[in-house]
Amino acid sequence: MRTSTLRRVGTGAALAALLSVAACSGGGGGSGTAGKPTGAGVADAGSVTALQQIRKKTGTVRSARIEGTTEMGDTVSMKQTGTIGWSDGLTGSLTLTYTGGTMAEALKQGGGDGSVRARYLQDEYYADMGEAFAATIGGKRWVRYAYQDLAELGGPAGDVLEEQVQNSTPEQGLKALLAAGDVRKAGQEDVRGVPATRYSGTVDLAELTGRNSALDAGQLAALKERLSAAGVTRQTVDIWVGEDGLPLKKTERGETAAGTFSSTVFYSDYGTEVSVRRPPAADTVDFKEILRQRAAGPS
């Protein structure tokens, strides 16, 4: 495989997988460009109180099963399923199925079947690229990516995703809503047959101040830093909460520095066991090592 093609395949798999986990865990990857809802500008006090209680409870359960879809412009569209945990940094196992975009095409060029198994640990992530890709890199099918390498691999998009992944929990989506000056209860709806309350809000970076936010100064500063790093001007978030006080569904949409973004995530089985191990060393290769080995070859 040509070095340039290998780089596209490997980098695409890394960034898509990290985009997935950032979206699933509510890392603030989406930013909306739609105008503010009618009656926006004043947060509903009852909704703020309810969301503060929901965020506190969500922070105690520490794991969940997820199912979702993510789209980033013409770069990637995909589905993801698996489990994530956040008791000590973000960990989890997801299966990613690519349904379109340039990343999907790059994976096909590398002999992939459109699916990648991913394992997330505190400082690194592993992707099972399949037998066809493994045959081009010495037979090892698991590729390791260190989060600190993402900026080098993916430029601005990688830098943003590194920060999001290492700071993401399902609480982040709730924090975004609490930062919105227009957060409100948007009605009662069923989520896959389960009664839920929907909360909606739009976070405008230019208007994030302590005066119209339910976050403290430290939380607000951290959120502003994440949104600014991603090139976000406005982020639209909707969360559906079940009668047990835990999120059942989350949507984000809008624009980022990496392109138009939208995601939908369903949460279930809170408290499920999440056990993630590194793949066997004998079947693993570091992506940067692959690139170093190919650097002297054709490009």
Regions found by a protein language model. Name each.
Residues 1-15:
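N-terminal export and membrane-targeting signals
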Residues 2-6, 25-299:
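Subset-of-secretome marker
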Residues 20-23:
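C-terminal motif of bacterial Sec signal peptides marking the signal peptidase cleavage site
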